[in-house]
Regions:
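Conserved AMP-binding A3 loop
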Residues: 52-56, 187-211
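Conserved AMP-binding/adenylate-forming core of the ANL superfamily
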Residues: 8, 16-87, 91-95, 112-117, ...
Length: 236
């Protein structure tokens, strides 16, 4: 069972229940100022301190992104890199990639410009989705990164060398794309920490992504009544 089916199931069964919550340290809240030091939430300067989406909206956003990808030529087996801090858009983008049958490639947000280029070329990514904090690092090698790749920017004031995520998905269908995905299809590439050299790419099938989610749930014993605090970076 591909992990995307869990999202679609929850959207059907619990459409109006909250699925994701983002707390933005750029909007101070005296009850949560200790979060600021972690710098793990994508800046959203024109949004309130707290943003949230329901399961149905989560799934719709993933579908819109998936349909946008397909419309731009992304197909099963292609690779889409994600270079963003933790934010409300991160998981809908990740699941949107999976829904196309493409392979999600999360990048460590600590990568410098050369490491980004190295990993993009090593994984042979077809698209890089990045946030505001990474404009400078992407721009450093924008000419090489944009050769044969699409650069998609998530945020306000889109740089000239990229295309705007929000504009691209605005008119896309919220229905799931008609793509068959099996447990044996490849779903993600995660990179090693690179402590002994440049990071190494590790390819995962959908089956391993599903099993990881199941093991996490069993380990923590969580249920739909619980709220799971995600402090670690989502690329990990």
């Amino acid at each position: 069972m591909p992990v995307t089916e869990y999202l679609e199931r929850n959207a059907r069964l619990y459409p109006d229940e909250v699925a994701l919550v983002e707390l933005n340290p750029d909007e101070p809240d005296t009850r949560r100022t200790s979060w600021k030091e972690f710098e793990l939430i994508q800046p959203s300067r024109f949004e309130p301190y707290r943003r949230e989406i329901t399961w149905s909206v989560f799934d719709e956003k993933a579908n819109r992104f998936a349909n946008m990808l397909i419309g731009r030529g992304i197909k099963k087996g292609d690779k889409v890199a994600i270079l963003m801090y933790n934010c409300l858009e991160w998981l809908p983008i990740y699941f949107g990639v999976l829904k196309t049958g493409a392979i999600a490639v999360p990048f460590n947000f600590r990568y410098d410009a050369e490491e980004i280029l190295y990993c993009a070329e090593l994984a042979e990514v077809d698209m890089i989705v990045f946030g505001p904090a990474f404009i400078g690092r992407i721009e450093t090698n924008a000419e090489r990164l944009s050769k044969g790749r699409l650069l998609i920017y998530v945020g306000d004031n889109c740089p000239e060398f990229a295309e705007s995520y929000h504009q691209l998905v605005a008119d896309c269908s919220s229905h799931a794309p008609n793509v068959e995905i099996t447990d044996d299809d490849f779903g993600a590439i995660y990179f090693s920490s690179g402590t002994t050299g440049f990071p190494k790419a590790i390819l995962h099938k959908h089956q391993s992504l599903t099993q990881a989610a199941q093991m996490e749930q069993k380990h923590h014993g969580t249920s739909r009544d619980d709220t799971f605090l995600c402090i670690p970076p989502l690329y990990h």
